[in-house]
Amino acid sequence: MVKRSIYLDHFQDQEASALVVDGVLQDFFIDNDIPTPGQIYRATVDRPIKGQGGCFLKTPDGSAFLRQGKGLSQGSRLLVQVSGFAETGKAIPVSRKILLKSRYVIITPENPGLNISRQIKNEERREELIALIR
């Protein structure tokens, strides 16, 4: 029987978690207040920038900038994903294209197709993953 344990604690004043399987560390995560690529926010359009075609958004962690903001009006709500690290004093760069990445698959909501990792060479395993997704 596989023994799985999740440990929650603080590391250097930040929340941390670890996944241990059969006494071996499998995953380690430190939560910080800096928005990192991959985080998903429900944002509200703050003000469109007409000349650039983008817009500034309000998120729980501050201001964000969306490059492809055409057709959005002030007050509109949308889901966005952080696409890069924000420079000091600048807005968080975000995208409307949501990607949920894992070790085996990439899920692209609202887009057709299945994306299975190329590292999985075993055809049976690939078919199992496809069956789980559908």
Where are these regions (language model features)?
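Single-stranded RNA-binding surfaces
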Residues: 1-134
